[in-house]
């Protein structure tokens, strides 16, 4: 099973309706291509922008095809792959695309979270490498 975890910056602020449409289309695509995963959206009040954090998992061919689609989508930019690799089993097997719209209260409960791009984030990257994206996503999946 192949997986890819990435972050990106939304090209615009996503309303609940925008997110619902995005999820509906993503779930249709994912079901048709055997993709499962989790999508996290967060609007940052300080920077007045939204960010996505997503894990997709499936066969290597399905991930490559889906990644081409994701990376050319004009609804976001500045895509950064945090991690990719192989796993023995699906991590989000029941979700064609799980979703969380995260606010400040949720993030306060995530161990080791620092705002993407903040001074604290880059200090942690310098000291420890990239944060453990899998455990962060698992925290959202488990219902932080």
Residue spans of the language-model regions?
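Charge-rich, low-complexity N-terminal segments
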Residues: 1-144
């Amino acid at each position: 099973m192949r997986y890819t975890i990435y972050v990106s910056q939304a090209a615009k602020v996503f309303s609940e309706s925008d997110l619902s449409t995005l999820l509906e289309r993503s779930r249709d695509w994912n079901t048709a291509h055997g993709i499962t995963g989790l999508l996290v959206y967060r609007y940052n009040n300080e920077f007045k922008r939204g960010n996505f954090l997503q894990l997709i998992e499936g066969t290597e061919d399905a991930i490559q095809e889906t990644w081409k689609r994701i990376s050319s989508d004009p609804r976001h930019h500045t895509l950064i792959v945090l991690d990719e690799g192989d796993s023995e089993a699906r991590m989000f097997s029941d979700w064609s695309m799980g979703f969380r719209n995260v606010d400040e209260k949720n993030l306060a409960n995530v161990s080791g979270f620092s705002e993407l791009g903040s001074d604290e984030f880059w200090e942690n990257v310098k000291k420890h490498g990239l944060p453990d994206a899998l455990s962060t996503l698992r925290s959202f999946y488990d219902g932080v």
